Amino acid sequence: MVMDVDQKKSIIDVHAKHEGDTGSPEVQVALLTARIEQLTGHFKTHKKDFHSRTGLLKMVGQRRKLLKYLKAKDVQRYRALIEKLGLRK
């Protein structure tokens, strides 16, 4: 269930604004989205795993807050990220 180091590094490389960038909202949202997708697949087979579902809901809330922040700061970056990740907003 834990994200592979290579997966995480590739996601960071794609969304980073500069070398060593791990904290920008784009990188954080991309990592949360990958983790959310991973957990969604987990719940298809483990329907009664309510403890992990709580963690999933926290991740979704954190991603929503980061997207709200990014939208308030720079709408163009927000729209580009939404399109790149394929989120519904």
From Swiss-Prot:
It holds the Pfam family Ribosomal_S15. GO terms for biological process: translation. PROSITE patterns: RIBOSOMAL_S15. One of the primary rRNA binding proteins, it binds directly to 16S rRNA where it helps nucleate assembly of the platform of the 30S subunit by binding and bridging several RNA helices of the 16S rRNA. Part of the 30S ribosomal subunit. Forms a bridge to the 50S subunit in the 70S ribosome, contacting the 23S rRNA. Belongs to the universal ribosomal protein uS15 family. This is Small ribosomal subunit protein uS15. It comes from Nitratidesulfovibrio vulgaris (strain DSM 19637 / Miyazaki F) (Desulfovibrio vulgaris).
